Structures are given as C-alpha cells and as structure tokens.
Amino acid sequence: MVRSRWKGIYVAKELQNYNTVSNPTIVTTERSSVIIPYYLSKTIYVYNGRKYVGVKITEKSLGRKLGEYVLTKKVEKYKASKKVKKK
C-alpha cells in the first residue's frame, strides 16, 4: 500500500538530526526511510541484518526508500552438475 499523502514522507529521526560536519559517515538501520535531497552525493550505510552496506545517493535515487538498494537475502547460485563419463 502507498502511504497517505497527508502524512508526508517518512524519514527516520536519527537521519533528520544527523550532523555530517562532525561525523561524515551516516549509519542507520531504517530501511523504510525515504531518500531526500539533503543526502545527495553522500554515502549512507544501511544495515541489512548481517552487516552495513554503503549506498551512494544520486539524483536517480531521490524519493525512493533506502531498503531498495540493500539486499537482505543472499542470491543463490546453482552449480552445474558434473556429468559422469561411461567407459
């Protein structure tokens, strides 16, 4: 479902009050926060459940959520089965 327009966009309080002058790295666990223009050309480290993954913010990513750029599940790679040669 889409968030109601009258509520506005959701940005975590820890991201709103972040001072990049004293601490240039932004670290958060809020995957549901919307990317706003204040974070343009900065790197935000988002927690995916195991480790923090860096997300570089560009103009194309404005208005989207941080969780869209951080995968939480490992991509499964299937190995090719070995064929047995008959003698």
Swiss-Prot record:
InterPro entries: Ribosomal_uS19, Ribosomal_uS19_CS, Ribosomal_uS19_SF
Lineage: superkingdom: Eukaryota
MF-aspect GO terms: RNA binding; structural constituent of ribosome
GO CC list: mitochondrion; ribonucleoprotein complex; ribosome
Keywords attached to this entry: Mitochondrion, Ribonucleoprotein, Ribosomal protein
SUPFAM superfamilies named in the record: Ribosomal protein S19 (SSF54570)
Gene3D superfamilies the UniProt entry points to: 30s Ribosomal Protein S19, Chain A
Major location category of this protein: mitochondrion
GO biological process: translation
Subcellular location: Mitochondrion
UniProt keyword Oxidoreductase present: no
Matches recorded under Pfam families: Ribosomal_S19 (PF00203)
Disulfide bridge partners, by residue number: none
Family classification: Belongs to the universal ribosomal protein uS19 family.
Protein name as catalogued: Small ribosomal subunit protein uS19m
